[in-house]
Amino acid sequence: MKIEVNKNLIKHLENLSLIQLSQNEEKMLENDITNIIKFFEKINELDLSNVEPLFHPLPQGRLRKDTPRDPLDRENALKNVKRKENGYIVGPRTYGE
């Protein structure tokens, strides 16, 4: 799949990111994204048919067993929370006022 990097894509990314870029920044971002995509296209051209898969140095990951356990009750869950309201945790605003 070929991604076309153009002004419309940059504007779309600005909207998704909730940022505004100057024309100079837009042009720089367009060039950067184009270079990144070209780099990945070069990687995709590599012939890896004779390359063996990598191994992990440890026989098993350091993840804990996922064993079910009883959840915290509401009182204990809210015990150390700074901001709570009506039994819910109040987080910081992320957008708007």
UniProtKB/Swiss-Prot annotation:
Family matches, as NCBIfam families: gatC, PRK00034.3-4
Gene3D superfamilies: Glu-tRNAGln amidotransferase C subunit, N-terminal domain
Role this protein plays: Allows the formation of correctly charged Asn-tRNA(Asn) or Gln-tRNA(Gln) through the transamidation of misacylated Asp-tRNA(Asn) or Glu-tRNA(Gln) in organisms which lack either or both of asparaginyl-tRNA or glutaminyl-tRNA synthetases. The reaction takes place in the presence of glutamine and ATP through an activated phospho-Asp-tRNA(Asn) or phospho-Glu-tRNA(Gln).
Reactions performed catalytically: L-glutamyl-tRNA(Gln) + L-glutamine + ATP + H2O = L-glutaminyl-tRNA(Gln) + L-glutamate + ADP + phosphate + H(+); L-aspartyl-tRNA(Asn) + L-glutamine + ATP + H2O = L-asparaginyl-tRNA(Asn) + L-glutamate + ADP + phosphate + 2 H(+)
EC numbers, comma separated: 6.3.5.-
Protein name listed in UniProt: Aspartyl/glutamyl-tRNA(Asn/Gln) amidotransferase subunit C
Keyword flag Isomerase: no
Bias-annotated ranges (Basic and acidic residues): 63-77
Subunit structure: Heterotrimer of A, B and C subunits.
InterPro entries registered for this protein in UniProt: Asp/Glu-ADT_sf_sub_c, GatC
Species: Saccharolobus islandicus (strain L.S.2.15 / Lassen #1)
Assigned protein family: Belongs to the GatC family.
Entry-linked PANTHER family: GLUTAMYL-TRNA(GLN) AMIDOTRANSFERASE SUBUNIT C, MITOCHONDRIAL (PTHR15004:SF0)
Taxonomy, superkingdom: Archaea
Top EC class, one word: ligase
Residue ranges of coiled coil: none
Keyword list, A-Z: ATP-binding, Ligase, Nucleotide-binding, Protein biosynthesis
Positions of region (Disordered): 58-78
Keyword flag Nuclease: no
One of the GO biological process terms: glutaminyl-tRNAGln biosynthesis via transamidation
One Gene Ontology MF term: glutaminyl-tRNA synthase (glutamine-hydrolyzing) activity
Annotated TM spans: none
